[in-house]
């Protein structure tokens, strides 16, 4: 959660990036046309000036009726009877429809774009070729404005994934993940992790975004909490020097409304349960920028999967902490009858909508909320005891840094001193197919960064100097002034995007490309 220092209201947006955005679209369309000529009729994709090609191109797209149809368009979302917001959604609803796939069974999807802006649709957490993954930086063709694109792919891996826009928003709070373009995906596994009676999907999302100045991000919920003194000194010195030069704090984004499954607390249908029932909650943090928490008074969550991947050590916790784009699958045994609020720990956010009512059969009345005791979120809790991760073939050192208010009042972000160039889109790291790599990430800022790797999953192997293993994810929260190590096998040829999943960070430089040959 961001605690704003000073709000700008009404919103005074910084100078627009429309001209830059138009230039980028034109360049990418040019590259797309070039790829069509180069590939002589094969599936369209972008060809970049790198050593890699679209070696893992998508499957031939069959004719006939699609298995699924997704339509991006403007709509009104009724968060509450007296609070209706305009935004862009899938199929006229928020969240987008739940898509259930079978692992290994090809699907055909028609994606319609009824907006005035070329769009991208990213299949988050799946191992897909670059021309369907849904990132322009990798080479995925745009879905043209008022146009359509049909794609075919084989879903995988099994588990809880999701789909969302992957458009640069910059200073436009109607675009990208500030919009309602997000929906859940569940790829049926051969065997479910844990026994349960039924499942419930929850998508957490904020609405009515606005710009604010400065603010501090709470991070005392993360464990281990040890900070690296060298990183802290570097980050704090850079901030002090910036402020001493008269620079204000960089823009942040806040929100006025909060919802679960598109309804503010108390304005949607409750989750109706029976005593003794075991409910598997699949929780998606669909936020553009926020870290969320959830608690259900009198109950515990048995976490069985993170980001759709079964954990080695399922464990009960009183609170879920979920970074931007993370997913948690947890079983709750209903053994405390009553009417309760399943909600965020932040009182302001919960009172403004971030909650849903859990109603036991035979019980009525005002939903109750009881704040839980302080609890630290630690990925190691779900790890393999005494895990000894396989030694990598190579280690890639990465340092993340913030340049306060450096881009028209917005914070700019760098990886190893380089701000990602949306015009050039050059790979920073070169990989060999089949090799195992360790990303050693050093965070020289006080922000938490939910780090995401496209087209792969990774194993968390060290957090703040503490070894661990066995937890497989595609997004992981890296604490302020902390280090984290994650291992992955470069088994996807071509370009792979790596970035902080906070829209405000990735739009201003916090991205890098891997090129695997």
Question: Can you say where each PLM-predicted feature lies in the sequence?
Answer:
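N-terminal export signals
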Residues: 8-9, 29-50
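C-terminal structural cap/anchor segments
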Residues: 396, 403-406, 415, 420-446
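C-terminal soluble interaction/assembly domains
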Residues: 461-491
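Active/binding-pocket-proximal capping segment
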Residues: 297-310, 416-418, 444-471, 503-507, ...
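A structural feature that tracks compact, well-ordered secondary-structure segments
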Residues: 282-286, 292-297, 331-333, 341-347, ...
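N-terminal secretory signal peptides
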Residues: 1-29, 33
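Histidine-centered copper-binding motifs that mark active-site loops
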Residues: 24, 34, 47-324, 330, ...
């Amino acid at each position: 959660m961001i605690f704003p220092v000073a709000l700008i209201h009404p919103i005074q947006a910084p100078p627009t990036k429309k001209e830059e955005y138009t230039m980028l679209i034109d360049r990418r369309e040019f590259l797309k046309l070039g790829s069509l000529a180069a590939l002589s009729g094969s599936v369209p994709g972008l060809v970049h000036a790198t050593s890699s090609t679209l070696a893992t191109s998508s499957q031939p797209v069959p004719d006939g009726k699609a298995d699924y149809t997704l339509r991006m368009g403007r709509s009104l979302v009724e968060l509450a009877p007296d609070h209706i917001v305009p935004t862009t959604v899938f199929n006229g609803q928020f969240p987008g429809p739940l898509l259930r796939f079978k692992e290994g069974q090809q699907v055909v999807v028609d994606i319609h774009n009824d907006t005035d802006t070329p769009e991208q649709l990213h299949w988050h957490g799946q191992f897909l070729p670059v021309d369907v993954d849904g990132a322009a930086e990798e080479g995925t063709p745009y879905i043209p404005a008022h146009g359509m694109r049909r794609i075919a792919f084989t879903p995988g891996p099994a588990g809880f994934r999701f789909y969302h826009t992957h458009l640069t928003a910059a200073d436009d709070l109607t675009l990208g993940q500030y919009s309602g373009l997000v929906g859940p995906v569940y790829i049926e596994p051969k065997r479910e992790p844990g026994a349960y009676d039924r499942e419930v999907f929850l998508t957490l999302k904020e609405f009515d975004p606005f710009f604010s100045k400065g603010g501090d991000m709470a991070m005392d919920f993360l464990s281990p909490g040890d900070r690296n003194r060298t990183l802290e000194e570097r980050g704090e010195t850079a901030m002090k020097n910036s402020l001493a030069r008269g620079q204000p704090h960089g823009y942040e984004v806040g929100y006025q409304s909060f919802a679960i499954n598109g309804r503010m607390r108390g304005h949607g249908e409750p989750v109706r349960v029976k005593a003794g029932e075991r409910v598997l909650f699949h929780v998606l943090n669909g936020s553009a920028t926020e870290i969320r928490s959830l608690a259900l008074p009198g109950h515990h969550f048995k976490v069985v999967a993170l980001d759709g991947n079964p954990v080695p050590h399922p464990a009960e916790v009183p609170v879920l902490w979920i970074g931007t784009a993370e997913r948690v699958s947890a079983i709750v045994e209903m053994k405390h009858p009553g009417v309760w609020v399943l909600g965020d720990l932040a009182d302001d956010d919960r009172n403004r909508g971030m909650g849903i009512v859990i109603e036991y059969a035979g019980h009525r009345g005002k939903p109750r909320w009881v704040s839980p005791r302080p609890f630290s979120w630690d990925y190691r809790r779900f790890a393999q005891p005494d895990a000894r991760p396989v030694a990598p073939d190579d280690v890639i050192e990465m340092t993340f840094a913030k340049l306060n208010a450096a881009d028209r009042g917005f914070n700019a972000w760098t990886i190893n001193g380089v701000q990602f160039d949306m015009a050039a889109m050059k790979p920073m790291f070169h990989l060999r197919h089949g090799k195992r790599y360790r990303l050693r990430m050093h965070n020289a800022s006080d922000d938490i960064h939910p780090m995401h790797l496209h087209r792969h999953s990774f194993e968390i192997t060290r957090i703040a100097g503490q070894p661990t293993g066995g937890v497989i994810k595609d997004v992981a929260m890296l604490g302020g002034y902390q280090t984290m190590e994650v291992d992955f096998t470069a088994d996807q040829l071509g370009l792979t995007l790596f970035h902080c999943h906070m829209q405000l960070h990735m739009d201003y430089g916090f991205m890098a490309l891997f090129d695997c040959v």
